[in-house]
């Protein structure tokens, strides 16, 4: 990520945004409705290296759950936000697919293309930060899930891998719950054909 940040910053020499923080703010975060105070990166600092304004994009980020969810929603829709293509579809597909390197890596994202998590659909991908902060995106389920909190504990005998507790405590239970909800859906009523709702009101079904 550090090398990628350097390359992107070098490519911005003649652009309106001179650093990656400004680029992300103007091209992504503001267009998807994330307030400036809801996110930060690189500990809020900028360093000059080789005459370039470098932001430490590989760490020091702070994002609210809502901000992360909006980014996940943007990626779910392959870079499209309310009809406007902010990122090219090809770029989104490339960075969220298996890059062919160890550890289920995409480019800045993690991919389930290899089936690392057997209970997750193969099109699932996720971003993660320190302390098991995670955003999971599953296009085939139209799913975006965000997890913020403390570091998750590994189970006894569990492989010493960063994503194992996330897989066991978040990914698998979440997908099992969704699949179970679909499987256990109640049949349609023979007596009620429709229930009219006022404009703007949505129905939330309890399938328990």
Predicted regions mapped to residue ranges:
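Extended, well-ordered alpha-helical scaffold segments
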Residues: 19-28, 84-95
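Structured C-terminal helix/loop/strand segments within mature extracytoplasmic catalytic/sensor domains
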Residues: 127-207
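Solvent-exposed loop/turn segments at secondary-structure junctions
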Residues: 1-2, 44-47, 68, 75, ...
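Extracytoplasmic, non-cytosolic globular domains
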Residues: 7, 58-61
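Active-site helix/loop module of the DD-peptidase/beta-lactamase fold
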Residues: 13-58
